[in-house]
Amino acid sequence: MTEVSKAAAFDRTQFEELMKKRFFFSPSFQIYGGISGLYDYGPPGSALQSNLVDIWRKHFVIEESMLEVDCSMLTPHEVLKTSGHVDKFADWMCKDPATGEIFRADHLVEEVLEARLKGDKEARGQNSNDQPEESDDKKKRKKKVKEIRATRLDDKTVEEYEFILAQIDNYDGDQLGELMKKYDIRNPATNGELETPRQFNLMFETQIGPSGGLKGYLRPETAQGQFLNFSRLLEFNNGKVPFASAMVGKAFRNEISPRSGLLRVREFLMAEVEHFVDPKNKEHDRFDEVSHMPLRLLPRGVQLEGKTDILEMPIGDAVKKGIVDNTTLGYFMARISLFLEKIGIDMNRVRFRQHMSNEMAHYACDCWDAEIQCSYGWIECVGCADRSAYDLSVHSKATKTPLVVQEALPEPVVVEQFEVEVNRKKFGPRFKRDAKAVEEAMISWPESEKVEKSAQLVAEGKIIVNVNGVEHTVESDLVTIEKRKHTEHIRTYTPNVIEPSFGLGRILYVLMEHAYWTRPEDVNRGVLSFPASIAPIKALIVPLSRNAEFAPFVKKLSAKLRNLGISNKIDDSNANIGRRYARNDELGTPFGLTVDFETLQNETITLRERDSTKQVRGSQDEVIAALVSMVEGKSSFEDALAKFGEFKSTQE
């Protein structure tokens, strides 16, 4: 689309009014008072989301030949207990004992310190207008706190605050509690003291079936269903690795304090990719296609220094220097960047931030977030994690089901390794019903532990085997642990997983913010400059007036566009044509087709482009062909101007 000049500062109040007026999204159950963290999408919001998902599928699933699945939202307790979510999928919350109000501890510390720094800038006479606009709930809390008025802080305190904010995601509950105590962080509304932070599990618990005996949860992510179907997916892919599965679906998180509109909600749409790869070879065969792409990186080391300086470099160099671990992780980071650019995100407001060690998910060994800046600050929208072999390993162990790849070796290999062999005649009678569990525990030991136990068996004549918290003594006459040679023709391994995970609701929101601007000549005329490929409606059809002669032509034109897959809307209301254009600019409709009296004579129509408001005129077939080409991204409006020439009109 045409480049636009967003001279006016972003006005969130005005933007939110447009979202409400045009019903992009709205709080759920609003006539009953609504529930925080739950939202409904209206017609333009639903269409925008559908187009976003469609572009995502084409960009990832089709382009990368991924295997798409659709798995159950209800997940049994055992699955999420095994995955670690029951014990570790939590945030830190603190409670005001006087009012009962609940705060998410890291967000509270962040908001209060940011507000104090803002007050310090005001006291020093510095301009703080470059700070992201604050949410209404932030403002309400901040304005009641005495410490954050225009009060000058000493330089050391400012430095401490900035250091803390640069690595706010790296603090655990005890550390957050210490920060709250050290810097006297209280309930911003009442100034009341808060309880020590404690963990709150974010999953929605439910009962499966009428008896209530089977506990389950609404899934917190779509990944687990993909892992549990790994063997079927591997078979579907003819046993070949690497390959990727993909899924788009709803996930649920019982957020402590939902806020910021669509950015922190309790029900949301995710799109996740699980790329299964050989742990000994994490090279991606298409990395050369993207290695030249510059990405804006915020590595862990920079954050640990209390800084947020962006390091911009080609992803190929980032991998060579060890900043990004491997080419598969780097490839997906580059592909994520291309996707965000394709849908219309302002790439000058995107960065890839590496997770700190303390904020890393329990399953990840490395993770980079694609964060996008909007009026709420930097928002995590896409995570790109190396989950190693964690998920497949824990599910395999829990179910005693091998979730592995078996690969024929080009040549047989002679290997030496320690093996456990029990004396069947003595072992069974000695341990009775525990015999199988004790034997399996010894066999499952890693090589290093088998070496250690073998030496202990020789030195002491016995070893201790722990099974489910119970210690069993195994004497040397019951078991042998020795190094043996054998020939292998098959290599068996558990693949590692690289996981790009997309919060589509967050992406949708920041896209709408980035697309929004107002006409310089009239700040009340809002425009949403969506790329044509993602716009909810591609074309507006406007008859010049309500003259009955226009109706047949308008209906035929609309039908032609629908047959070509171009969504369109007819606006034959009594409003003047400029007003009709303006309200569809608010919907992000990129093109307008005008039917007038000249159309009735020679079947020519006018094509208007949303951002520039420039128009061209040509025959119906030629204009439709140009429109389709622009919607498909094969040409631009500049190409249409070159072909048809600009048509001057006074209709706006």
From Swiss-Prot:
GO molecular function: ATP binding; ATP:ATP adenylyltransferase activity; glycine-tRNA ligase activity; protein dimerization activity
Residues binding glycine, per UniProt: 221, 272, 499-501
Catalysis performed (reactions): tRNA(Gly) + glycine + ATP = glycyl-tRNA(Gly) + AMP + diphosphate; 2 ATP + H(+) = P(1),P(4)-bis(5'-adenosyl) tetraphosphate + diphosphate
Domain of life: Eukaryota
Signal sequence range: none
Keywords (A to Z) from UniProt: Aminoacyl-tRNA synthetase, ATP-binding, Cytoplasm, Ligase, Nucleotide-binding, Protein biosynthesis, Transferase
Main location group: cytoplasm
Cellular location(s): Cytoplasm
GO CC annotations on file: cytoplasm; cytosol; mitochondrial matrix; mitochondrion
Keyword Ligase found: yes
Listed Gene3D superfamilies: 3.30.40.230, 3.30.720.200, Anticodon-binding domain, Bira Bifunctional Protein, Domain 2
Chain segments carrying region Disordered: 119-145
Entry's Gene Ontology BP terms: cytoplasmic translation; diadenosine tetraphosphate biosynthetic process; glycyl-tRNA aminoacylation; mitochondrial glycyl-tRNA aminoacylation
EC numbers: 6.1.1.14, 2.7.7.-
Keyword DNA-binding: no
CDD domains: GlyRS-like_core (cd00774), GlyRS_anticodon (cd00858)
InterPro entries named among the record's database cross-references: aa-tRNA-synth_II, aa-tRNA-synth_II/BPL/LPL, Anticodon-bd, Anticodon-bd_dom_sf, Gly-tRNA_synthase/POLG2, GlyRS-like_core, tRNA-synt_gly
SUPFAM superfamilies linked to this entry: Class II aaRS ABD-related, Class II aaRS and biotin synthetases
A Pfam family that the UniProt record links to this protein: HGTP_anticodon
Binding site for ATP: 253-255, 264-265, 380-381, 506
Family of the protein in this entry: Belongs to the class-II aminoacyl-tRNA synthetase family.
Function: Catalyzes the ATP-dependent ligation of glycine to the 3'-end of its cognate tRNA, via the formation of an aminoacyl-adenylate intermediate (Gly-AMP). Also produces diadenosine tetraphosphate (Ap4A), a universal pleiotropic signaling molecule needed for cell regulation pathways, by direct condensation of 2 ATPs. Thereby, may play a special role in Ap4A homeostasis.
Assembly: Homodimer.
The protein's name in its UniProt record: Putative glycine--tRNA ligase
Organism for this UniProt entry: Schizosaccharomyces pombe (strain 972 / ATCC 24843) (Fission yeast)
Lineage: Eukaryota, Fungi, Dikarya, Ascomycota, Taphrinomycotina
